[in-house]
Every structure is written in C-alpha cells, then in structure tokens.
C-alpha cells in the first residue's frame, strides 16, 4: 500500500 512492499502490499490489501 504505502511503504510496506509494492509486491506484498498489493496482495495484502486485496486479501484484506
């Protein structure tokens, strides 16, 4: 999302 990870945050946000 913001500063997490452009790869992990993408799946993390969509999953949540």
From Swiss-Prot:
GO terms for cellular component: cytoplasm. The keyword Transport does not apply. Keywords: ATP-binding, Chaperone, Cytoplasm, Nucleotide-binding, Stress response. It comes from the Bacteria. Induction: By heat shock and primary alcohols. One of its GO terms (molecular function) is ATP binding. It is found in: Cytoplasm. Its main location: cytoplasm. Belongs to the heat shock protein 90 family. Homodimer. Molecular chaperone. Has ATPase activity. This is Chaperone protein HtpG. It comes from Acinetobacter calcoaceticus.
């Amino acid at each position: 999302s913001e500063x997490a990870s452009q790869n992990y945050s993408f799946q993390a946000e969509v999953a949540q």
